Amino acid sequence: MIRMNISVRNLKEITDLLSTIVSEAKFKVDENGMSVTAVDPAHVAMIRLEVPKEVFSEFRSDGTEEIALDIDRLKSVIRLANSSENVGITKDKEKLKFDLGNISKSVSLLDPSTIVTPKIPNIASEYYAIIKRSDFERGLRAAEDISDSIRFVLSSEGFRATSHSESEESEMVLPKDMLSDLSCSDTIKSSYPLEYLLKFIKAVSSADSLKISFRDDYPLSIEFYLDQNPSAKIKGLFLLAPRMEQ
């Protein structure tokens, strides 16, 4: 038996994040809450979300179950709701029923065995910066019409994001005093595909800050919390493979 009640805003943000890399996802529901891990078909980006039961206004799960869903179908349900509403979710055999005020809609579940849950790689780095989401977004937006990649540089002095083409270039500089925290004793550099980052930053609009971690030509790790619910937060992890440059 699964019965949940969650704000439409939280559900939309979860769905928007997943839709940046996958069209189908498998959720694990147990006594602690709900979690999902997904990787895009090209194995370039991965997302991990942990939704503690405290995020839900109602939460009941008898044991551990897996729920596999088409993300577009989930988004079609969310479009029926007002952003200030809550949505009730109940598993009924092979369907998931959504109650939104005086509207109810059932969506067929997918076979969970057809969706592989990826293993999260151990790519921890001791180098990181905690950056305001709004500052990070400005750096990405400055680069989006210049190149399809962006280069990050982290040092003891701060964080830089640069992009260039034959005719244009952009640079965002965040000195140490503009960062919430910084841990870096060296100068490290790595480039990443901009398309994935632009989709990601748009989907995490409620996050206040991002913990960005990487090494030279190494996968990028971004840890964040979604802040729609002041009493409990959704914990997220975004991983992105580097773009190797000549």
Swiss-Prot record:
Homotrimer. The subunits circularize to form a toroid; DNA passes through its center. Replication factor C (RFC) is required to load the toroid on the DNA. It comes from the Archaea. SUPFAM superfamilies: DNA clamp (SSF55979). This is DNA polymerase sliding clamp. Belongs to the PCNA family. Pfam families: PCNA_C, PCNA_N. GO terms for molecular function: DNA binding; DNA polymerase processivity factor activity. HAMAP family: DNApol_clamp_arch. One of its GO terms (biological process) is regulation of DNA replication. InterPro entries: DNA_clamp_sf, Pr_cel_nuc_antig, Pr_cel_nuc_antig_C, Pr_cel_nuc_antig_CS, Pr_cel_nuc_antig_N. Sliding clamp subunit that acts as a moving platform for DNA processing. Responsible for tethering the catalytic subunit of DNA polymerase and other proteins to DNA during high-speed replication. Keywords: DNA replication, DNA-binding.
